[in-house]
Amino acid sequence: MEGAKPTLQLVYQAVQALYHDPDPSGKERASFWLGELQRSVHAWEISDQLLQIRQDVESCYFAAQTMKMKIQTSFYELPTDSHASLRDSLLTHIQNLKDLSPVIVTQLALAIADLALQMPSWKGCVQTLVEKYSNDVTSLPFLLEILTVLPEEVHSRSLRIGANRRTEIIEDLAFYSSTVVSLLMTCVEKAGTDEKMLMKVFRCLGSWFNLGVLDSNFMANNKLLALLFEVLQQDKTSSNLHEAASDCVCSALYAIENVETNLPLAMQLFQGVLTLETAYHMAVAREDLDKVLNYCRIFTELCETFLEKIVCTPGQGLGDLRTLELLLICAGHPQYEVVEISFNFWYRLGEHLYKTNDEVIHGIFKAYIQRLLHALARHCQLEPDHEGVPEETDDFGEFRMRVSDLVKDLIFLIGSMECFAQLYSTLKEGNPPWEVTEAVLFIMAAIAKSVDPKKPFSIAVCHHSLLFGWNITSEISNCEYLSVLRENNPTLVEVLEGVVRLPETVHTAVRYTSIELVGEMSEVVDRNPQFLDPVLGYLMKGLCEKPLASAAAKAIHNICSVCRDHMAQHFNGLLEIARSLDSFMLSPEAAVGLLKGTALVLARLPLDKITECLSELCSVQVMALKKLLSQEPSNGISSDPTVFLDRLAVIFRHTNPIVENGQTHPCQKVIQEIWPVLSETLNKHRADNRIVERCCRCLRFAVRCVGKGSAALLQPLVTQMVNVYHVHQHSCFLYLGSILVDEYGMEEGCRQGLLDMLQALCIPTFQLLEQQNGLQNHPDTVDDLFRLATRFIQRSPVTLLRSQVVIPILQWAIASTTLDHRDANCSVMRFLRDLIHTGVANDHEEDFELRKELIGQVMNQLGQQLVSQLLHTCCFCLPPYTLPDVAEVLWEIMQVDRPTFCRWLENSLKGLPKETTVGAVTVTHKQLTDFHKQVTSAEECKQVCWALRDFTRLFR
């Protein structure tokens, strides 16, 4: 907001409009105006005035929120000599407004906490606050609020206070932690039966536990710990207080993850949590789900904390396996939300046990995992009155998917085959309800792929078995059947045979899940090809029924992927399905999956048949595109070609026949015939980014399919790309250009044409990025531009390095290093790394000296700027996950010329700010020299990365 300060009356009107204007557009205008006000320098004074006047809750909340935001993001706007008066003003406001609204108190508490963290001159802020307000009972609630949010804000990403200041703060808070605990004890004594005060005490204590500054020996014998468990054991405790106490215990458990250094507190927490089993059962009996969930959270955190002990010393001391019993008790609760809380622990347990690879240890945990799996199978049961197929996108469907993932991760402890056989035996014994059958089949489907069809497993198999309660008889002769059993695993074969013979009268959900199971058992089908016909017949029945069609299509896709050679004889059948694809009620993903499976089988046909078959497979989609091109746009008729483009793309992507050198690619003729249709489609929809993206994707896989066999398309394709891109800057053209460079960049006759393409594409690209916030608004363009440039460096480095466009591209790469976008930043860093690496790579090749010279010229011109920018972006712009990529670029620069890099890095370090605007030390001279030495003496890239991680923390 530029210009003069707005009047308070105008601000009040905007706040009123934001909360009370019945017109949504009025609310939107008010929100925008107030947002501009918050970003202006006038916000400080206006917020202070609004808080003084206290006209209404809405204006006070806006002012408190604004004050917090300004302190977090714009503290540098204030002169240092105004900080003390701001502090005093905020403390006055929170005292005056303490009874108006809890959310206002929280916002002001955050503002005070953030101010304290950024104000080095406010020494011992905890002691100051406690001395000032602890004797006034009415001030205790907001005092506790400040002391709660203060530790929480220490690691806030909104505050870039740096590691040095953060360390200073943590040491200060640790020093005064006993003062805070004493205050909390006083509050408990004064609280009596005041539940709200107790909740604030527990929240505050949990916050200090989370920061890790409480003395564990002191806390082990503290009355607050005993009070926590007393509250959790009492049946009469309210839900809100119970949740606050539970959160606090979880925070305490999290804080002692390093058990050995916190042994006294660890023992107290361990014993305390074990006493909560009775309280859990009482909560179950009272059907108090909130408390049940709280107990499960505590039990899970207990197991997470003592995981190392549980795995290394199971059944001994803190490795007591009663912890697992508590989780299995929770797994027995009828609500699936309860067991779901513990999933992360079970994942971690499985990971630890997998790494130990100790059969004796594994044997100890096997029974626990078996019990867990049986509980999970029960939780996966649908309601008996459920109709239709299982939902996969609702909460319960997502829970089942998480169960499936967990089972896959834990199955190694039981043994896939043993578990599969156990589950199967539960279905053979008796006549279980349909929902039990479906859930067991679901778990079997989760582990089917991990079952080795070659591994023998002894289990009694009766030829006339009762499968799932239905009598089945094999059409295979006894002799043939016994032969199969001798060669393969009997359980797998019997399951497969039983599933494909399920009567159509069973519940739709059972059929649906059995189809999924068949799809997961594709390796068994591959080893038992005599089952292929009945399996395909079974899946075709499902394909013809709307509820089952997509699952059946996915299963057929799986069969095609694994049984490609056996499926070749069924290609004509697949072709018929593909021709009538839209007659089946398939999801778009399932339809594409079917075509993928068909293409995989097509690639296994004899080369002389592939051309004709591919043409047949593509013809339906091509005819549909032609029809769309010929019709005039009209209301009610879709002219969207993306469905057919996606289908062609998947066909091209997965038709990968083995073609010997000198042979004409069998797909070449078909793609050349289809090109005019794709070209016309692209031209018609040139302004529609979504459709153009699908066109480019289709062309990308067409080019990849035939490789250099697409040479005839190169000239017309590049011409059309450049022409359209000059009018409509769809970044997918840059990506498609990178594919062309990858395929043809090493062909001498194509290099100049590809360079011309790059230069032509760069002109509108640079114009786009030069716009205001161009990099931030067009990250996809940045991503694809540097993919294209990287391909050039990889395939024809000298061509690019000699060109006039290399310096502008590098300048844009340097500018783009600040872009906080994962994919775009990764592409930029990869380009920089590969560009510089060109100067040292493949020194045996004849163009090495030329490459080395050209890279030297580029680095002499822009090397210092690049190093300075990389250091700046690491410290101030990019998240930590980008540091390995930056380290690789710095490492490559060092490999080219280490002495020069040392100078560049030294100059860059001199340009960094050494203090914050309020005088706090950001980085010391020793820290600068240590970092310089660590980087320049590094013998591996990972050492550069480690040094960067530590150094950049000083500025975060």
Residue ranges: model-predicted function:
Residues 1-956:
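Karyopherin-beta/Importin-beta family HEAT-repeat alpha-solenoid scaffold
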